[in-house]
Structures are given as structure tokens and as C-alpha cells.
Amino acid sequence: MAVPRNRHSNARKNIRRSHDAKKARHAAVCNNCKQAFIPHTVCTSCGFYNGKAVMTVEKK
């Protein structure tokens, strides 16, 4: 098996890992109910996607 010749420093390790953090999810506004939802998914509050009713949502 391959073995590293030299040890990587902590700084080099941390610089490599600086891009590994999870990114915050963006939110869009539904055109039908004006609630925030994740883009490219069905709106969870009204059930619309791309201006069309895709699923029925039970009202509380």
C-alpha cells in the first residue's frame, strides 16, 4: 500500500477541509401562498410546484 512520505501539517489539513462544511439551504418564495420553500421541490404549505397543484395538503 502507498504510504505518505512526509506528514501533512495541521494548517495544510485545515486548509483542505475549509470547503467541507455544509452550506446553508437557500429558500424561495411560493407564488401561490407566499411561503418560503426549498427550490425545485413541491411547496409544503400549499402543494403547488411550478404554478400547478401537484399534491393535496391537509389544512390544520
Swiss-Prot record:
Disulfide bonds: none
Keyword vocabulary terms for this entry: Ribonucleoprotein, Ribosomal protein
Keyword Ribosomal protein among UniProt keywords: yes
Molecular function terms from GO: structural constituent of ribosome
Gene (UniProt): rpmF
Cellular compartments per GO CC: large ribosomal subunit
Matching PANTHER family: 50S RIBOSOMAL PROTEIN L32, LARGE RIBOSOMAL SUBUNIT PROTEIN BL32
Chain segments carrying region Disordered: 1-21
Family per record: Belongs to the bacterial ribosomal protein bL32 family.
The protein, known as: Large ribosomal subunit protein bL32
